[in-house]
């Protein structure tokens, strides 16, 4: 069902994809935290989320142990996520695609050959109210503090 004020099918769930480089640190953390927020607001079934990486190097791997440790510290647990690469059809299937850094955003826009998903692709920091950086730093090559 569409209407003039909200020109999308509101009977279908809103689908959000979080994207980082390898889908083992930032994007799965965003997905885990977001799913918890959705569940707490009782929006299950109305909002769906997933995560993916720009590269498939870690395909099938769980999130980085250091990220899981940091999430656990704040009360979050991994519901069994496994890394997967971004697919071209993700650009059509998701209503919002959230990139963690400029490189992710650039690569997502390159995948969008005809420009139809351009308005769906946004930076994660667009939603940050207390984090003033323009991108979420990749903690992979750093120490444990980078995962906090």
Segments from the language model and where they lie:
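Conserved active-site segments centered on acidic
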Residues: 2-93
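Phosphate-binding/catalytic loops
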Residues: 2-7, 13, 96, 102-148
């Amino acid at each position: 069902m569409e209407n003039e004020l909200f020109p999308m099918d509101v009977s279908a769930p809103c689908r959000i994809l979080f994207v980082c480089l390898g889908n083992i640190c930032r994007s799965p953390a965003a997905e885990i935290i977001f799913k918890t927020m959705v569940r707490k607001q009782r929006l299950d079934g109305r909002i769906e989320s997933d995560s993916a990486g720009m590269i498939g190097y870690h395909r099938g791997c769980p999130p980085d142990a250091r990220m899981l440790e940091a999430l656990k510290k704040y009360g979050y647990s991994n519901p069994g996520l496994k890394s997967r690469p971004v697919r071209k059809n993700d650009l059509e299937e998701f209503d919002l695609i959230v990139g963690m850094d400029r490189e992710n955003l650039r690569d997502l826009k390159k995948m969008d050959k005809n420009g139809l998903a351009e308005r769906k692709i946004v930076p994660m920091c667009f939603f940050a109210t207390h984090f003033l950086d323009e991108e979420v730093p990749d903690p992979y090559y750093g120490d444990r503090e980078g995962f906090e």
